[in-house]
A protein has these predicted regions:
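Positively charged n-region of N-terminal signal peptides that target proteins for export
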Residues: 1-4, 20
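Hydrophobic h-region of N-terminal signal peptides that target proteins for export
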Residues: 10-18
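Short glycine/proline- and aromatic-enriched beta-strand/turn motifs that initiate or cap beta-hairpins
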Residues: 19-71, 196-198, 202-208
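Residues that define the transmembrane beta-barrel architecture of outer-membrane proteins
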Residues: 30-34, 51-57, 98-104, 117, ...
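Transmembrane beta-barrel strands of outer-membrane/channel proteins
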Residues: 34-42, 74-80, 121-127, 166, ...
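Extracellular loop and loop/strand-boundary signature of outer-membrane beta-barrel proteins
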Residues: 44-48, 89-96, 145-152, 185-189
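Gram-negative (and chloroplast) outer-membrane scaffold detector with strong preference
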Residues: 60-141, 170-172, 205-208
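Predominantly the C-terminal beta-signal and adjacent terminal strand-loop region
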Residues: 81, 85, 160-208
Length: 208
């Protein structure tokens, strides 16, 4: 995991250094977006058997071609998944353990038009590391839930994140926006499939 973070940091540093030139070799101008993205979401499908909501904060760096209206960037952060609770008659309420995630995503965004108001559609492709409690995944495990302390798994999964968003430039340096996304992580080995519906707020610092 430390190796992945180091590689990501080197890529981000290279992008920042490259941004000082402001134009590609073919002359097309571009901007660099540095973004802070707090978000919240609702667990869906099998993910909702063990968790209720998901909250997190991400950092993103995006290289945006002004004429092509295409943005390519990297995003990483931390997610906290609120655990589900179970209550049986004559027994106290018991909570699952919370799940924790670290996503690393390569984003592709297309801006419908590149003005002060910038609506866009996009797709994120990447991996996510997480630690999960699957104690409530099946009826059998639910019946035995009070007899165990923790039924956990951890590891990496591959995921896709389709999204739509809106960015509003307040001036040539600062912007704010909203992003609606449907992240989907594929199951792998004993890690279950996960998807949710998320809404995020974006603050963007523009390096033009």
């Amino acid at each position: 995991m430390k190796k992945h973070i180091l590689i990501l940091a080197l890529i981000l540093t290279s992008l920042c250094a490259f941004s000082q030139r402001h134009r590609l070799p073919n002359g097309e101008p571009y901007d660099i977006f540095m973004q802070i993205k707090p978000m919240g979401g609702i667990a869906l499908g099998d993910f909702a058997k063990n968790n209720t909501y998901i909250y997190g904060s991400h950092f993103a760096l995006e290289f945006q071609l002004q004429e092509t209206k295409l943005g390519i960037g990297l995003e990483f952060g931390y997610n906290y998944c609120v655990p589900m609770a179970i209550k049986r008659p004559f027994l106290q309420t018991k909570n699952n353990w919370a799940s924790h995630q670290i996503p690393m995503i390569l984003n592709f965004n297309y801006y419908i038009f590149n003005e002060r108001i910038k609506p866009y559609v996009g797709l994120g492709i990447g991996t996510i590391w997480g630690r999960y409690d699957y104690s409530l995944s099946t009826e059998e495990s639910t019946e035995e839930y009070y007899l165990r302390d923790f039924e956990g798994q951890s590891g990496w999964r591959f995921g896709l994140t389709p999204k739509v968003g809106l960015m509003i430039s307040m001036d040539h340096r600062h912007g704010f926006g909203l992003e609606f996304s449907l992240p989907y992580q594929f199951g792998f080995n004993r890690l279950e499939t996960q998807y949710s519906i998320n809404l995020g707020l974006n603050y963007t610092y523009i390096i033009d």
